[in-house]
Design a protein with these regions (language model features):
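Multi-pass membrane proteins that catalyze or facilitate reactions on polyprenyl-/lipid-phosphate substrates
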Residues: 1-278
Length: 278
């Protein structure tokens, strides 16, 4: 149980930072007594905890967007005080979620196996760290969420799909795309949080249903241990969101970029020396 709780802590600490939580869980598994990959199922279910933190932290934004979208699209009647921008943002969350739903379904076997190679994780940690660094450095910071278009939503969605490979980082990829498109850091980060909700809940609930219906005796952690890790991820994740929103209002992503590159190089050295297995 302690191992699972530790991984839940790690999930909460890293999910929203552009450093890839799935890569950290995959790597940490190599150093724990139950050494090995915690698995895509464990990772997806614990991410439900961190997304619950998003729902609570952004509850007013989400409630406003959902109410405006439902009243306009389903009820066909605008509610007093609703904004066309909220309706549009609701559509952009849906549009931006399409790529990861399609690609996640098509590549689900690769997600469970091939994509979890530590060699691949180390390389993409470095490569996407450099990409995020360039995007953040030269991004124009002239757009906010009012500028979101269908093309930008799809671009964000394609970037999010890259995070199907551990090491890319969902937030890192979407933030980099936002900066490339000229969005301010706070706007890119906020949309990144909102965009992740459908994808993460969809993946997590699917894996949870599978885990309950098809018990896997080879799984390193039981459902009880996984649920415990999910609760820890929720608590820690909420604190990280609050900290990150304040941090990014005055700072750049450079500390995370340096960390990604250093960690990626460290993983390569550990693999090359035989200290850990891919």
């Amino acid at each position: 149980m302690l191992e699972a709780l530790f991984l839940g802590l790690l999930q909460g600490l890293t999910e929203f930072l552009p450093i890839s939580s799935s890569a950290h869980l995959r790597l940490a598994g190599e150093f724990l007594p139950k050494a090995g990959d915690p698995g895509a199922t464990f990772t997806a279910i614990t991410q439900i905890g961190t997304e619950l933190a998003v729902l609570i932290y952004f509850r007013r934004d989400i409630a406003r967007i959902a109410a405006a979208w439902l009243s306009k699209v389903i009820v066909r009647k605008e509610i007093p005080g609703s904004s066309p921008q909220d309706v549009r943002l609701g559509w952009m969350i849906i549009v931006g979620s399409i790529p990861i739903v399609v690609l996640g379904y098509l590549f689900q076997e690769n997600i469970r196996n091939t994509f979890r190679s530590l060699w691949l994780i180390a390389i993409v940690m470095i490569v996407f760290g450099i990409i995020l660094g360039i995007a953040d450095k030269f991004g124009r910071s002239e757009r906010d969420l009012k500028s979101l278009s269908s093309k930008h939503g799809i671009a964000y969605g394609l970037a999010q799909s890259l995070a199907l490979v551990p090491g890319v980082s969902r937030s890192g990829a979407t933030i980099a795309m936002g900066r490339i498109l000229g969005y301010r850091r706070e706007s890119a980060l906020r949309y990144s949080f909102l965009l992740a909700i459908p994808a993460v809940f969809g993946s997590g609930l699917y894996e949870l249903k599978t885990a309950i219906g098809e018990s896997d005796p080879s799984a390193p952690y039981s459902l009880i241990e996984t649920f415990g890790a999910t609760i820890v991820a929720f608590i820690v994740g909420y604190a990280v969101i609050a900290w990150l929103m304040k941090f990014i209002s005055t700072k750049s992503f450079m500390p995370f970029i340096i960390y990604r590159i250093v960690l990626g190089m460290t993983i390569l050295l550990l693999l090359a020396s035989g200290t850990i297995n891919a």
